[in-house]
From Swiss-Prot:
It catalyses: Hydrolysis of (1->3)-beta-D-glucosidic linkages in (1->3)-beta-D-glucans. The chain crosses the membrane at residues 313-333. The gene is btgC. One of its GO terms (biological process) is cell wall organization. Residues 1-312 are cytoplasmic. It is a single-pass type II membrane protein. Residues 1-96, 119-168, 180-202, 335-369 are annotated as: Disordered. This is Probable glucan endo-1,3-beta-glucosidase btgC. Glycans are attached at N405, N428, N456, N632.
Length: 685
């Protein structure tokens, strides 16, 4: 983290006092809340929209998720790569038990990228464009939580694309408020062991027993819908995913930069701090985030009706063939799953039964002890981007997120970092994270509050109002490191960056004024692509938070650490010269699989060129980056801890990495072959 412990200097006054030591111990008995955090039943009585919001004037922001793919490429422009955090075919990629929010997370990216008033329906008006999902970079949290321009996508045709959607506020109760916190968590002494084929919403690794397996938050009795109606989803992207604007000019969004840092020249200097192979002329385009912005064809687009008896004949013939094959495969799968079901009783625990079996999980719970004692996890990350599962509107009103699952996530996160970054305030996600920290008695854990900002004034006002409520309900606000108002709002503004920036700054000013009135001594910031930061935005923020993803620059894993350091130091660090403002890399990471990216507007000619997604490459980047960053005091957030399987829908033929950015799979298991450096025992503050 940026602070007095750096072994080098940026030659600017950005080295403020370190903040690790000013973390007040969490009162395990009293908790952080003046009042108990909201708690909810398994199923909210709200089955329809609480209200229909009218359109508000275009604000310059594109409604989108907090993460999406953005290209850091050799040429100017945005890459068409998209990032989904983790999706596994055949697994519960959409349910509340999956990391990132399942189907509820899908609503974020999809809903925000279209000119409709609500839900995934927006995808129907994209003129065939594939809009990438992103969390913080595109997508994250997050998540997601990073999305590149969709393949073949042109610029947005009209201001209609900026039109806000119907949304639901944080003031809407999620189920019965009096329900015990643990009641939301799927149950069983072991995490969900349901068959992966029981429901499309079952979590990855559901057949594996143990504390790293995600539980299904809903029973097989029909608590969770097997078919989602896109018309019922109105999402604002606060999970870190955002739609990526098409057609941004290469000249305005990507500029060639020297590769001195990537080289780690023998002469030393700032760039010599990160030793890696030289990357030639890397340029920066949009970087994929953690959101639903991932550019890909909408699953909701209806096929054009076919004509002709011959075509119908072929269809009927193929259908019969599929039925025969399906019967054979179904028999085999059924037998296998039947055996597994016999081996694992109590496979369909609901959230309420989890509470009955496990109560409100805490540090003394057996499965939590297992999660918090993994020798392969090391606390070497200054911060981690995180979006709880199932925190998207309005689906969370009917299917509330699970407190116990958040507690499990935080237990794992505590082995990696002392700082967690959130992307929004909807669905009581902040309260659940704080509750988990209290239950686990994590004295040093801190939280960066997140506020999602898009083109819908109602959404923005709701998010900010909930931010204020969280602060009012928190006894000891020293647990917070600050508030991040907006993630990649300028990136999502497309060509209307000027008006978007003006409105974003006005929201930041409003929050800052409120904090002054309440005597909250907390910094206000926003996060965006590294090359979207200019002096006027720096003036309005207390920190410069840049999303920097080497994978989308088309550089090799060996060049990645140097490229990241170089880009950040040449584009963002100089902006704070002569001030006491810190610079933070708000998102950086590498996918564990799914193809390769050769930079903005560059198509890879083979599968080994450019940035290759893979475990070996991920290990290479972490080996070069993590310990050196820890040693020289670089403050950054890693994207991300857990895969988000539901994002598989945003993968394309050549870009299948959207669901694979986590250090761990959706079941909280470290990916096979992945090695987190221990940095000689040194840990992040």
């Amino acid at each position: 983290m940026s602070g007095p412990h750096r072994s080098f200097s940026f030659n600017q006054g950005d080295d403020g006092a370190g903040d690790a030591g000013d973390v007040s111990p969490i009162r395990s008995q009293e908790g952080h809340f003046m009042n108990s955090p909201p708690r909810h039943n398994d199923v909210s009585p709200v089955s329809a929209r609480s209200q229909a919001m009218g359109s508000s004037p275009s604000s310059g922001f594109l409604s989108a998720h907090e993460h999406g793919d953005r290209g850091w490429g050799q040429n100017s422009g945005h890459t068409q790569a998209m990032r989904t955090n983790s999706t596994t075919p055949g697994m519960d990629n959409l349910g509340p038990a999956a990391v990132g929010g399942g189907i509820s997370g899908i609503a974020l990216g999809v809903a925000n990228s279209h000119n409709r008033q609500s839900g995934i329906d927006a995808f129907r008006d994209t003129d065939g464009r594939n809009l990438p999902a992103e969390r913080g970079y595109n997508t994250t949290g997050s998540d997601n939580p990073y999305v590149p321009t969709p393949p073949g996508g042109g610029s947005h045709g009209s201001a209609e694309n900026l039109r806000p959607r119907d949304s639901y506020g944080s003031n809407v109760a999620l189920g019965a408020a009096a329900a015990p916190a643990g009641q939301l968590t799927p149950g069983g002494s072991n995490p969900s062991q349901r068959s992966l084929f029981d429901s499309p919403y079952q979590g990855v690794g559901a057949m594996d027993a143990g504390p790293y397996q995600r539980q299904s938050a809903y029973s097989a009795a029909g608590d969770y819908p097997l078919v989602i109606n896109p018309d019922e989803i109105a999402d604002d992207g606060d999970d870190g995913f955002t739609p990526v604007p098409n057609g941004k000019s290469a000249s305005s969004n990507a500029r060639a930069i020297p590769a001195a840092a990537a080289g780690g020249a023998a002469g030393g200097g700032l760039f010599g701090l990160f030793k890696s192979k030289k990357a030639d002329n890397p340029s920066y385009g949009p970087v994929p985030g953690a959101g639903l912005e991932a550019g890909e064809k909408s699953r909701w687009v209806k096929p054009t009706p076919g004509g002709g008896s011959r075509k119908r004949g072929w269809i009927v013939g193929l259908a019969l063939a599929f039925i025969v094959v399906g019967a054979i495969v179904g028999g085999a799968v059924g037998g296998t799953l039947g055996n597994r079901e016999n081996e694992a009783p109590d496979t369909t625990k609901s959230a309420s039964s989890d509470t009955e079996s496990n109560g409100d999980l805490n540090k003394d719970s057996s499965e939590i002890k297992d999660l918090m004692n993994n020798p392969d996890l090391h606390k070497v990350f200054p911060g981690m981007d995180y979006t709880p599962w199932g925190v998207q509107y309005p689906l969370c009103l009917k299917y509330p997120p699970s407190q116990n699952n958040v507690t499990r996530d935080v237990a794992v996160l505590s082995q990696l970092t002392n700082t967690v970054r959130l992307y929004g305030t909807d669905c009581n996600q902040t309260e659940m994270v704080l509750h988990a920290i209290d239950r686990l008695e994590l004295k040093d854990m801190k939280v960066w509050l997140g506020v999602w900002i898009d083109s819908n004034d109602t959404t923005n006002d709701r998010q900010i109002k909930q931010l204020y409520k969280v602060l009012d309900d928190t006894k000891d606000i020293s647990i917070f490191k600050g508030a991040i108002v907006g993630n990649e709002a300028l990136y999502r503004a497309g060509n209307d960056i000027a008006s978007a920036k003006k409105k974003l700054i006005s929201y930041m000013d409003d929050v800052r004024n409120h904090f002054k009135e309440k005597n909250y001594d907390l910094p206000i910031a926003t996060s965006d692509l590294g090359d979207n930061w200019k002096e006027d935005l720096v003036t309005a923020t207390d920190l410069v938070m840049s999303n920097v993803h080497p994978f989308f620059a088309g550089v090799t894993a060996k060049e990645a650490a140097g490229w990241t350091w170089n880009f950040w130091n040449q584009n963002d660090v100089p902006l704070t010269k002569g001030t006491n403002k810190k610079q933070v890399i708000s998102e950086v990471g590498w996918p564990s699989g799914g193809g390769n990216d050769c930079g903005s507007n560059n198509k890879c000619t083979d599968d080994t060129s450019g940035s290759v997604a893979g475990i070996d490459e991920m290990n290479q980047f972490m080996s070069d980056w993590i310990c050196q960053a820890l040693e020289n005091g670089t403050d950054y957030f890693w994207f991300e801890a857990f895969d988000e399987p539901w994002k598989v829908q945003y993968n394309t033929k050549d870009e299948n990495w959207e669901d694979k950015w986590g250090l761990m799979d959706a079941a909280r298991k470290l990916k096979p072959g992945l090695k987190i450096p221990d940095c000689g025992g040194k840990t992040a503050a």
